[in-house]
């Protein structure tokens, strides 16, 4: 079970990962002069997003609800967050690969095509949704109902079985 001291540590880690992701999204265009700098930032950002998703899944798997077999309840409750995690990592990797492909050969020339600009805007829009839902899910995972047997859980179990 997740203890209160451990929860605050995990929550701090999750917020730190979100803050780093926000930093890279905000300032990666300013740090592009040698392309290798931007490449390292993009790799660290993608690894951070994957690590944040792993931490989120570990928190979901650690709940009493999951251990009681009500996986469908967790999936229903946090479905949007899980889908946004997958979409956001796919958009981020796509944008990073496209940008690095264009910038590696000519770092000082204009590389913004219409498709790249559309992908950039879409990735930034999904990033806002991802940040909101991820933070909301991370904070709601602190609810004590998820970590011990309760009347709410028994009612949900009866509803699923009946």
From Swiss-Prot:
It is a multi-pass membrane protein. Keywords: Cell projection, Cilium, Cilium biogenesis/degradation, Glycoprotein, Membrane, Transmembrane, Transmembrane helix, Vacuole. This is Transmembrane protein 138. Glycans are attached at residue 6. Belongs to the TMEM138 family. Required for ciliogenesis. One of its GO terms (biological process) is cilium assembly. InterPro entries: TM_138 (IPR024133). The gene is tmem138. The chain crosses the membrane at residues 7-27, 41-61, 80-100, 110-130. It comes from the Eukaryota. Its main location: membrane. It is found in: Vacuole membrane; Cell projection, Cilium. GO terms for cellular component: cilium; vacuolar membrane.
